Amino acid sequence: MGDGSSSRSNSSNSTSEKPEWLQQYNLVGKIGEGTYGLVFLARTKTPPKRPIAIKKFKQSKDGDGVSPTAIREIMLLREISHENVVKLVNVHINFADMSLYLAFDYAEYDLYEIIRHHRDKVGHSLNTYTVKSLLWQLLNGLNYLHSNWIIHRDLKPSNILVMGDAEEHGIVKIADFGLARIYQAPLKPLSDNGVVVTIWYRAPELLLGSKHYTSAVDMWAVGCIFAELLTLKPLFQGAEAKSSQNPFQLDQLDKIFKILGHPTMDKWPTLVNLPHWQNDVQHIQAHKYDSVGLHNVVHLNQKSPAYDLLSKMLEYDPLKRITASQALEHEYFRMDPLPGRNAFVASQPMEKNVNYPTRPVDTNTDFEGTTSINPPQAVAAGNVAGNMAGAHGMGSRSMPRPMVAHNMQRMQQSQGMMAYNFPAQAGLNPSVPLQQQRGMAQPHQQQQLRRKDPGMGMSGYAPPNKSRRL
């Protein structure tokens, strides 16, 4: 297919050659690629011609159709709706090869690139208002997920998006639900799903082989992200032994222990039950660490509210680790500067907004992901989704909404989703409504959804007997 130019030109001469769904969009180019597949930037042809991120999944490893990971992501995203969670706009199937495309609202930025820009280009840290606003919105979205019994299981800076357009400028969106799971009374240990969470953000109970874990693993990851926003570098940069499927990662634990100190039975009573602590093949129990102290690494006063919140997120014992709901009520968010809905407005009258770079876009490709021969180019802000340094004065800054779970209603099933039997492909009974299979609350019950697992910090609270399945 060459560089994709000729095939794209031919298809543009005859739109009838394109699938009907594809004719809804004007392709801008490829903006990402990973183990899951490709991500494209497109614009809707109908006004207001908004930017859309289209995620194309690779075929399943067995070559027999749509990836189960993609199906699980769809099944979750179609059920949730919240300002701080990425919005699934549509699902498209190319029946010629059964390739799957998910369409999302496009986010111009992510925390990984924002942090890197400050570290490598700007040369100074993010201001307190921006850090606080980004963190509050992340916790707000996570609280919604946990209230609906969903663990994300892969929180990291690159999966935390930030909108760049005018209407939602500076709003955080949690993305990438490929590893997310329903977690109330699982039918089997979650450890059966294999290794989860990128290693630098992986909770110690996972590293030590816990078979049953809770939403507390997400809160550990948020703590790591919080520290990274403060220091512009990952807090625990362990080297992963990728050749092994064993969850135990000695170097990562070593990095954690050197900063937080050695865990003890007094602080973490259930530590003795974790397989890799119990077996102690690597003799980690006897190893002594001279902790440098978390406060010294993140440069925070130990009596400051910011340090108090961070230390509670990085609590060893998952039963004692702060929850998203509790974190939203923390003193840190009640002090000036208060967090806002737009994380990127200036925190001081004379302060300049940071001009973050737009995403590089490979414009020499098509929706099949044909390899380009030219390097990707950054598309001008006016042609994509807006520039960070636009006219966003102090008047655009707004206070966060009340700290409750917002927009609990679920997304309506679109026609694009109706075209494929997702429940059957996901191993669910298509004749039974999804809400019944998952134990999802009916509309009149939705406000009663609350986390009641041990990760809530409610020690001694027995999980409900109702099953939640995916």
Curated annotation (Swiss-Prot):
Per the record, the domain of life is Eukaryota
Active site (UniProt): D154
- Pfam families in the record: Pkinase
Q: Where is this region: Disordered?
A: 428-470
What residues bind ATP, as annotated?
I31, G32, E33, G34, T35, Y36, G37, L38, V39, K55
Q: Where is the composition biased (Polar residues)?
A: 432-448
Positions carrying Phosphotyrosine are: Y36
| Domain Protein kinase intervals | 25-333
The main enzyme category here is transferase
**Keywords noted in UniProt:** ATP-binding, Cell cycle, Cell division, Kinase, Nucleotide-binding, Nucleus, Phosphoprotein, Serine/threonine-protein kinase, Transferase
- GO CC term, one of those recorded: nucleus
What GO annotations for molecular function exist for this entry? ATP binding; cyclin-dependent protein serine/threonine kinase activity; kinase binding; protein serine kinase activity; RNA polymerase II CTD heptapeptide repeat kinase activity
Q: In which tissues is it expressed?
A: Expressed in roots, leaves and stems. Expressed in young dividing tissue, such as shoot and root tips, lateral root primordia, young leaves and flowers. Expressed in the inflorescence meristem, inflorescence stem and young flowers.
Its Enzyme Commission number(s) read 2.7.11.22, 2.7.11.23
Kindly list the biological process annotations in GO that this record carries.
cell division
Subcellular location(s): the record lists: Nucleus
What reaction gets catalysed by this protein?
A: L-seryl-[protein] + ATP = O-phospho-L-seryl-[protein] + ADP + H(+); L-threonyl-[protein] + ATP = O-phospho-L-threonyl-[protein] + ADP + H(+); [DNA-directed RNA polymerase] + ATP = phospho-[DNA-directed RNA polymerase] + ADP + H(+)
Instruction: Tell me where the transmembrane regions lie.
Output: none
The record describes its quaternary structure and partners as: Interacts with MED14, HDA19 and LUG. Interacts with KIN10.
Q: Which family does it belong to?
A: Belongs to the protein kinase superfamily. CMGC Ser/Thr protein kinase family. CDC2/CDKX subfamily.
Function recorded in the entry: Involved in cell differentiation. Required for the specification of stamen and carpel identities and for the proper termination of stem cells in the floral meristem.
This chain belongs to the protein called Cyclin-dependent kinase E-1
Name of the gene encoding the protein in the UniProt record: CDKE-1
